[in-house]
Amino acid sequence: MYSLIEAQLLGGKLVNRVMASLRRIIQRSLGYFCALNGILDFNTDIGTGNLRRYRVLFMYRLLHNFAVISLTLKFLFDFTDHFKYIESSTLITVNFFTYFTLVFFALLSSMGSCYQWQNRILAVLKELKHQRDLSRHMGYRVPRSKQNSIDYLLFALTVLLILRLSIHLATFTLSARMGFNHPCNCFLPECMIFSMNYLLFAILAEITRCWWSLQSGLKMVLLNRQLSTVAFNLWEIERLHTRFQCLIDLTSEVCSIFRYVTLAYMARNLWSGIVAGYLLVRFVIGNGLQDVELVYLVFSFITCIQPLMLSLLVNSMTSTTGSLVEVTRDILKISHKKSVNLERSIEWLSLQLTWQHTHVTIFGVFRINRSLAFRSASLILVHVLYMVQSDYISITN
């Protein structure tokens, strides 16, 4: 028995099984979290592909979304009642009104996308399940190293969710104990926005897995030169091209469905980066901060740092998705001299992929990748320097 356990550990089978079980548990739990936050009216268990509509979830989604919108508006209107505590601080006023505006926009974009494109989201998930079943039937497998990279991102996303819920609870408790009993606690809207971001992350991760399995099938066709005929290879390349094209179309469909969600995601990341960078400078300098202002700014910093942490995970996933076509074209460069027709078929497939992409875009203008992250960081740095310079001028005068 001990030798069997040792052999499994050495071969990595036990670790792979544990990772797969943990992945299924997390995917199912996050699917329940999405349903609990009124995102969709069907089960979003993407890992198992169990996609079923429930009338109870439909009614719950209506009631939940109405309650979230009502509470968010109440928080915003009640903020004016507490304005007397911070009316002397323009910084806090601008900060909180900007925060509420971005949260409200992200909330409306999430609800609007779910209401308007409910059937399209379900169709995308069903097609991904179909693609996954086809790959399993054909014997295509995702490389273990690549599968682990997505699993690690999923685990990090789960840790971030737990941290986010803990921070919200701790912030509310500390603010109540310190006497700042303002109703500006957007707990439910924040959870709903997080659920929508996870749904986008999960769909992109599933597209990436399906694409990686097709890449493994393409390598099998190009490298397995002895055990297959030319006619079979030509037929297999044609099938692979059809499925590659399907995944490219699904990526475009996802960008169309989530265009307002990704726009709100980008706007909030910019604001969070500016506020977090500015507060770091203010804390280091330590000039001109009142006690009330300091407490509010600390809470703002905690609120702003969470979207930035989430953006690292989503940006990593979108960067991986955007590079799928380029990696596939590199695989097609493998020489194959078995047949002239097969060589031409491979060249034709490469040409078909040349003018297409799997980039995640926002309204077709902004591309979510490392280049956008660099431009956003530059914009954040410029605004932070401008705000610090304005504070310095006001202090010296």
UniProtKB/Swiss-Prot annotation:
Source organism, top-level taxon: Eukaryota
An example molecular function term from Gene Ontology annotations: taste receptor activity
Keyword Transcription regulation in annotation: no
Ranges per topology, Cytoplasmic: 1-56, 112-151, 208-268, 315-375
Annotated keywords: Cell membrane, Membrane, Receptor, Transducer, Transmembrane, Transmembrane helix
Record's subcellular location: Cell membrane
Predominant location category: membrane
Any one of the GO CC terms: plasma membrane
Gene Ontology biological-process entries: monoatomic ion transmembrane transport; sensory perception of taste; signal transduction
Membrane topology, record value: Multi-pass membrane protein
Record topological domains on the Extracellular side: 78-90, 173-186, 290-293, 397
Transmembrane segments: 57-77, 91-111, 152-172, 187-207, 269-289, 294-314, 376-396
Function: Probable gustatory receptor which mediates acceptance or avoidance behavior, depending on its substrates.
Family: Belongs to the insect chemoreceptor superfamily. Gustatory receptor (GR) family. Gr22e subfamily.
Name by which UniProt lists this protein: Putative gustatory receptor 85a
Organism: Drosophila melanogaster
